[in-house]
Amino acid sequence: MSRNDSISRNDLHGEISRHDRPDRRRVLVAGSALVGASVIPGVAGAAEAGLASAAELTVRTRAFLAGLDQDKRKTASFEWDGKEWRGWNYFGFPSVTKPGLRLEQMDAAQKDLGWALLATVMSPEGLKKARNVMTLQDVLMELGDGVGQRSPERFSFAVYGTPSDTGVWGFRLEGHHLHQSIAMRDGQIVSVSPSSFSCNPNRVTSGRHAGLVTLQAEEALARRLIGDLGPRLQGRARLSNTPIDNILSYAGRERANGRKVGLPASELSSAQSDLLWQLIEIYAVDHLSSPLASAQKARLRTGDREAVHFAWYGPNTPERAFGYRVIGDGFVIELGSVDPAAQHLHTIYHDLSNVLGRQA
């Protein structure tokens, strides 16, 4: 187990350990607006309408639960909005597993039901990225990290509340460097965040999976954008020469980091603005199935597009640590480099209008 993956058992429900908690200097670098930033202009009421019908997801979630025996169903089921739902995270270390029923605990038919459930809300690209994150558990073991303890199937499926056309309930896929929370209200999908596809290593250079790159677009588009800015705009966008080494918007602080810092989109050229929105949609749209993706794209654009801010941290040098944040009227995106070579990356996307099914 690597130092950067270590957290204590008390961290399971959202408390961040000394290896994952951003220190005070990092918080100040990211912007001095962590306090009092929960009310974001343009967010309140933005998620009153659902994103898409939850009918198929409800049917497939019921089918998944029906395919489990009583003990497995109990393992996969939790109350709505309890400590497990609120205590999301994407951390992972071999000795402790996530709440829910793990793939490694399912038989082949149950796995098929689980993947069919995921396919109702995730695009083929999203499913591939999730599988890539899972595959990296094998890569870590090949590198001698967690041998005999990690598994590409140590990822949990969990249902929160009762799948129904009325009321509120949720579904979650969670494991090391992977987190997807979906919340439903009265037959509608209302929230698709937090969403995290993280990785270690991002670029696999040896072994059976050599050539695999998990967060290629997340890195390439952001580096291209900061590199395309002239010196003056780069100076506005770069808030620190020191990269951020982790996300700041962790469990319980999802809305605490929404103050806009960095370079506003109003100062970008048309081509640069297009790059920025490609980057945003990589995090918030492209991993989702249609028509959910179309509805999510429309929600993102309900705010002021010109007021979206892009903030960069660290150098823009290949294979060197970097970080960035993108903040809009109703969302925040973060990427941090845990290691100096930009191989261990943590990312997050939050819909600030509807965090875990709770409206702003």
Predicted feature residues:
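Generic secretory/membrane-interface signal
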Residues: 4-5, 14-17, 42-44, 63, ...
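N-terminal twin-arginine translocation
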Residues: 20-26, 35-52
